[in-house]
Amino acid sequence: MSPKDLTPFLTTLWLLLGHSRVPRVRAEECCEFINVNHPPERCYDFKMCNRFTVALRCPDGEVCYSPEKTAEIRGIVTTMTHSLTRQVVHNKLTSCNYNPLYLEADGRIRCGKVNDKAQYLLGAAGSVPYRWINLEYDKITRIVGLDQYLESVKKHKRLDVCRAKMGYMLQ
């Protein structure tokens, strides 16, 4: 027999032996299913048990929710985005390096991108905190563009008049 004749036999044997030694990964087990009409409140963590099941960790215990449609998974998880801490989001997918996560329609999670819809991002700020500052113009040094400065000098013909008219302190 030539090696060419043995190739299909060896390939089949290798596939059979190799396949039996590969560990099989099963979907993570969830708690017993509880039929709820609405997602529980104040939940602080979640896990996807398989493509169609989500388990919510709440103060009262772990509640499993198995939606009939995969689109409902997004709605269940996004209702608790306000209570997810940064560390919980990071532990879901550590390769994202504390960046927001994006929740796919079927429940899978990936690192968020700039063009993702904000309503399905986990760990993103809903608003940027800010504080109003009272501006006191006499204490602020304004930066003037060179073109604007030269126009004012040309118009007033004197540097000291230019400064007084424009109200700028040039450094």
From Swiss-Prot:
It is found in: Virion membrane. GO terms for biological process: entry receptor-mediated virion attachment to host cell; symbiont entry into host cell. The keyword Nucleotidyltransferase does not apply. One of its GO terms (cellular component) is virion membrane. Keywords: Host-virus interaction, Membrane, Viral attachment to host cell, Viral attachment to host entry receptor, Virion, Virus entry into host cell. Plays a role in viral entry into host cells. Forms a pentameric complex at the surface of the viral envelope together with gH, gL, UL130 and UL131. This complex is required for entry in epithelial, endothelial and myeloid host cells. Mechanistically, engages host receptor(s) including neurophilin 2/NRP2 to mediate infection. Additionally, monomeric UL128 may interfere with certain inflammatory cytokines to increase infection and dissemination by blocking monocytes migration. Belongs to the HHV-5 UL128 protein family. Forms the envelope pentamer complex (PC) composed of gH, gL, UL128, UL130, and UL131A. The pentamer interacts with host NRP2. This is Uncharacterized protein UL128. It comes from Human cytomegalovirus (strain AD169).
